[in-house]
Amino acid sequence: MWTLLYDAINGSNAVIANIDNASGTDADKVRIKGQALATRGYMYMMLASHYSFSIEKEPNAVCAPIWLEPSNSITALQGVPASSVSEVYARALQDLKDALEYIPENFSHGTVSTDQYKIDYLTLLGLLARTSLYAAQWEDAYNYAEAALKINPYIMNETEYHAGFNDCSNKEWMWGLTSTLDDNMPAYTFYFKDTTTDGAYYTSLCADPNFVYDNFEEGDYRKDMYILGYTQQGQEHKMLCTKFRFKDVDNQLADILLMRTSEMYLIKMEAAAHLSGKESEAQILLQEFRQHRLKDGYTASAVTAAGDDLLKEIWMERRKELWGEGFSLTDIIRNQQSVVRKQCLIQKLDAEGNPVQDSNGNIVMENIGHTTVKLPDGTDFVENSIYYLLRIPEQEELQNPNLYSKYPKSTLYR
């Protein structure tokens, strides 16, 4: 991940440094510079949210180097010092805010399928909302999410929600990568997600049955996505999820979701819960959002939780809504929470549905939940575990002589 992020940063730096002298219209060059700034800001947000603990825990902890100019083989070996997590977030936010000056408000990737990867004005607002939330800039997170929702407030209905999360034409999607027969590289990141469609071959992305059983209220149509069954090729009896399904099974194609409006609603309510005088608004927003995910005939209960209890309810709503979309680890880190894993034992049944017994006539139980319930060192899962973070690669430590010249190497890695 480190190399992927810095490759994108270096490419963005090259565009920013050279676009003014490139051929093309001034309008195109200005917009492209804005998109390069937004891309760089997005990459720095990814570094800050994965290589350091929460900014609220250790704002001055070492995180990652900040490069603002294109590098080459010489400058790369000279290296630059790693900045703190607060500095990396500040850089990310500055790049994204600068991009607002370059990407016109009326620029949209529209409905052309092959343009969905482009960062348009709406996508930029979404990136600002997400990054502000991660950086604990609650007012900015609220305002940017609200601005994005003014442009696109659409929320999927039940039919759309069960359509497979595989098509950029979905009106709730704000950003995505299309996959076609001519350009199918994005689909490679979808393969592991579809564990239920005939013709799919991966079996790894299964849900925690305890999460499903304990947290979805009656009438929540999202719960219908989770089914107890056998993974492809009948390998394991697990809690499967039908959320992600190939759009074209024969060619194993599916569009890749990067951002949607539901995330903006969740950002807005979480930010509101942190802001003075907006707690009641956060409660109403949460109730309204839950109502959208209920089947006809059901009514969401009023939200009465306050303070930390309200935040925990919002975080759980994020888990339920954004499951499998790449947010859970980041949320655990930034909210200083613990991974929760436990077994889920059920009565084992044979092919005819009869209880299986051992040689002594005892009912046989099987675990359909997690098989790994401890950290790699054998200890219990805890908040702020080093195992939740990605580590600065050893290659960077060996090749960058200035890496820890500004902020010391974390004692966790010594």
PLM regions with names:
Residues 97, 121-155:
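Aromatic-residue-lined binding/catalytic grooves and analogous aromatic/hydrophobic interfacial grooves
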Residues 118, 142-261, 296-301, 307, ...:
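Hydrophobic-face positions in mid-chain alpha helices that act as interaction patches
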Residues 9-12, 89, 96, 145, ...:
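Inward-facing hydrophobic residues that define packing positions of alpha-helical scaffold repeats
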Residues 1-51, 83, 100-105, 251-256, ...:
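Conserved, well-structured interaction surfaces
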